[in-house]
Amino acid sequence: EVKQRRRTEPRLRSYGPRTVISIVKTDAKGRQLAAKKQALFARLSKIQGSLINSIERNYWEAKPKLKALATKLNVPDYIIETAWKIYSEVAKQKLTMGRSIEAFVCASLYASIRIHDFPRLLEELTEVAMVQLRSVHRSLGLIVRSVLPVLGLKYRPISPEPLIFRFANELSLTIKVQKEA
């Protein structure tokens, strides 16, 4: 029975170490550590830093940025999950090398938004993320050509219906005008 059950979400993240060893000078109670202990923790921290590979470092930087951007835009969890799948495939294909992680995070989120037909514009994402539109366009092009076919996802044009109602509400137009549009 236990084997038949399937987890609906990951319990622990699948990247990076489970514990972070920092260079500390005090213990949990705030007391000063001995010099030998401080040196030990400094060495352990240095070793741990060298054991993390480039993809894990990339994930460490990208995941909080994706969550922050999605929170600011009020995007549902299923879109964030798809965006993370897209971004992790981008990192696995090493498309981020020499390019902006922020631009790829923004492009991954926008691709996910387009896949799920969520009413957000690219200009909104770039404004909130404070990333240049040009770099996001480049990253989005790479994602559409290289990543989405691998994941089997379809990138569709924006359907105008959700945007009509959204902009009509912002402009305080009547329902009659909204239906006519």
Give a label for each model feature.
Residues E1-A181:
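Non-catalytic, interaction-prone regions of core transcription and DNA-replication machinery
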